[in-house]
Amino acid sequence: MKSSVEKLSETRVKLNVEVPFEELKPEIDQAYKALAQQITIPGFRRGKAPRQLIDARIGRGAVLEQVINDMLPTRYQQVVEENELVVLGQPHIDITKLEDNEVVEFTAEVDVRPEITVPDFSAFAVEVPALKSNDEAIDAQIDKLRERFGELKDTKRKLKTDDFAIIDIEAAIDGEKLEEATTEGMSYQVGAGDLIDGLDTALRGLKAGESAEFTTTLKAGEHEGKEAAVTVTVQQTKERKLPELDEEFVQTASEFDTVEELRESIAEQVAEQAKAEQATAIRDEVLKAALAEATFELPEGVVEDQIHAQLHQLLNQVGGDEAALNAALEAQGTSREQFDADNRKNSEEAVRTQLFLDALAEQEQPEVSQQELTDHILFTAQSYGMDPNQFITQLQQSGQIGNLFSDVRRGKALAAAICRVSVKDDEGKAVDPSEYFGEEEESAEESE
């Protein structure tokens, strides 16, 4: 077999392959054997008909078609390996010459990973937010717990932010009442801001039995974008009374006995969350710096595949209905054009990041243990809300376990590189990235 590689661009090559027929004997033998099992020729047992009779019955062309189908994947892969190409996606293959008993020639165009120069991470210096005092965060968590056990009490005063109200709403356009925008006896928290623009402003200062009128622009439904006159009437006003923060409440609302124990537990949770956020900030800043340093061309075919995959995923959520997708986007205050632009930008960023991390992993050569791979598979299954055994079965059937292995490998490579970066917080204090990304902290999730 003869082959050559023609460079079409930094990210695409064309393989020219010539295979003499004498090298195709295994595929030819297998093709005749398979076809002999599929046809019946009088006087011969199934599978025993001679080749010339098979040619006469179905034509030599059918045999050659089978041979071509069998030989293309293996010969293509052989050329890829011989030339040490890192191919991306599926090739576009054309049979350019077929001379029976002489030669088969074909070309294969395919995207390849561009040359990527991995920068020196030890030269990077990044700044991240400092770990702040967590008293406010602790108090906020305790208040959330108190709110879960709070009681709504009737009031006679004017409504203010965070109060609750039982309200009636009526909307009209040009004096015509809109049934779909009319409701009675609805509970609403003032300041929620998730119903109608202008509603919170109208409610503040009202008492039970009072009404207010305002004009708003409808953001969804048949009359989306139109101006509507809205009347809101308050039936009842309520405020949430929070329980006292004492031992009785703590014992009712948690597994702890004292307020001090509750605060200590929440403080630990808040501190861990703050550290996780700082670790994420370090990772993001380092990766941003590395990608800015390592500029390279993106393979357009891979980007297009990513764009189509994201679009397909979103379309599945609306039953594959393009019109429904466009309507949903408009309801969110955007457009299909903006979505497509954002999708392309995000897809390019995703492809650029993955290609860079693959190059980094080749440089770092991290080892991935079976336990690390298993942990990542279990973590991913949990994130999808799937049974781990069912998830593993799906991975095996679709041949996707290798992708998760690559996720872990990329994560470990990036973790090792981050440990060489100089990190300070925005208060000027040095931060040791190995506390987050050292060997004992490495995990598959760091690649997410």
UniProtKB/Swiss-Prot annotation:
Q: What's the EC number here? A: 5.2.1.8
What PROSITE patterns has UniProt attached to this entry?
FKBP_PPIASE
GO CC list: cytoplasm
Q: Which GO annotations describe the biological process of this protein? A: 'de novo' cotranslational protein folding; cell division; chaperone-mediated protein folding; protein transport; protein unfolding
GO MF assignments? peptidyl-prolyl cis-trans isomerase activity; protein folding chaperone; ribosome binding
Q: Which InterPro entries match?
A: PPIase_dom_sf (IPR046357), PPIase_FKBP_dom (IPR001179), Trig_fac (IPR005215), Trigger_fac_C (IPR008880), Trigger_fac_C_sf (IPR037041), Trigger_fac_ribosome-bd_bac (IPR008881), Trigger_fac_ribosome-bd_sf (IPR036611), Trigger_fact/SurA_dom_sf (IPR027304)
The region called Disordered is annotated at 426-448
One Pfam match, by short name? Trigger_N
Name the enzyme group at the top EC level: isomerase
Q: Where in or outside the cell is it found?
A: Cytoplasm
What this protein catalyses is: [protein]-peptidylproline (omega=180) = [protein]-peptidylproline (omega=0)
Specify residue ranges for compositional bias: Acidic residues.
437-448
Is the keyword Chaperone assigned to this protein? yes
Give the source's domain of life in one word.
Answer: Bacteria
Domain (PPIase FKBP-type) spans 162-243
**Where would you say this protein principally sits, based on its record?**
cytoplasm
Q: Could you list this entry's UniProt keywords, alphabetically sorted.
A: Cell cycle, Cell division, Chaperone, Cytoplasm, Isomerase, Rotamase
Quoted from the entry, the domain comment is:
Consists of 3 domains; the N-terminus binds the ribosome, the middle domain has PPIase activity, while the C-terminus has intrinsic chaperone activity on its own.
Q: Which NCBIfam families match?
A: tig
Q: What protein family is recorded?
A: Belongs to the FKBP-type PPIase family. Tig subfamily.
Q: What does this protein do?
A: Involved in protein export. Acts as a chaperone by maintaining the newly synthesized protein in an open conformation. Functions as a peptidyl-prolyl cis-trans isomerase.
Name under which the protein is recorded: Trigger factor
- The organism named in the record is Corynebacterium diphtheriae (strain ATCC 700971 / NCTC 13129 / Biotype gravis)
